[in-house]
A protein has these predicted regions:
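Cell-envelope/extracellular polymer assembly enzymes that use nucleotide-activated donors
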Residues: 2-4
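Short, well-formed alpha-helical segments that are part of the catalytic scaffolds
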Residues: 11-26
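A conserved acidic beta->alpha catalytic loop
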Residues: 33-45, 57-59
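Conserved donor nucleotide-binding strand/loop of the catalytic core
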Residues: 46-69, 73-81
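Catalytic-site signature of metal-activated, phosphate-bearing donor transferases
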Residues: 64-75, 96-195
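Short beta-strand-to-loop acidic/aromatic patch adjacent to the donor-nucleotide binding site
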Residues: 82-96
Length: 195
């Protein structure tokens, strides 16, 4: 089993140290695409040993540049590097601390094409509270890890529609309850940034 983290990023320097400290213990390698960052993001990633592809590496794609194409090319790079399992978090996300020690064991149990489906915990106006109020921001589950299968590809157009390659259905999703792990989303933790 070779676990590769894949990450599209742009101007994420404030989140990358936390992302890296959380994901590196799980992954054998991380491959990222930098979409024209103007901050120190690329340097942070390279200093951490991440393989960073620039936008120019995939600029010659036919059909324009979309988030789906970025993700598909990240999967292609990860496959070329021998990846069998892929971790698909964004830079402003981390796994909960209870998941990190069991992550590789859970991944090793996945059949090709199976995914780990976890609760997406939207931190709300703080780093200590997440929304649990029966809105779109609570009880929201997403796929963040997939065991590769050669027939899978990424066919979505937007990042928010899916992270991993292949279809999401009852046959492919292995859902974890938050007692076993979740994903913390930091975008709204610093709510004053949006005011």
């Amino acid at each position: 089993m070779k676990v590769i983290g894949i990450l599209p990023f742009k101007n994420e320097e404030k989140f990358l140290p936390t992302y890296l400290s959380n994901v590196q213990p799980i992954c054998d390698e991380i491959i990222a695409v930098d979409d024209h960052s103007t901050d120190n993001s690329r340097q942070i990633m390279e200093d951490a040993g991440v393989i960073v592809k620039g936008y120019e590496d995939t600029e010659k794609l036919k059909g324009g540049w979309t988030c789906g194409l970025i993700r598909q090319h990240l999967f292609n790079y990860a496959r070329e590097a021998g990846g069998t399992h892929f971790v698909c978090l964004d830079a402003d996300e981390t796994f909960t601390s209870n998941f990190v020690p069991i992550a590789r064991d859970i991944m090793s149990q996945l059949e090709p094409g199976e995914k780990v489906h976890m609760q997406w915990l939207a931190l709300w106006k703080s780093y200590t509270a997440y929304r649990d109020d029966h809105t779109v921001w609570s009880r929201n589950f997403k796929d963040f890890i997939v065991a590769d299968h050669p027939d899978l590809d990424y066919s979505y157009n937007y990042m928010c529609e899916g992270r991993t390659i292949g279809p999401n259905n009852n046959d492919t999703l292995r859902t974890l309850e938050v007692e076993h792990g979740g994903v913390l989303h930091y975008q709204f933790a610093c709510f004053n940034n949006f005011l």
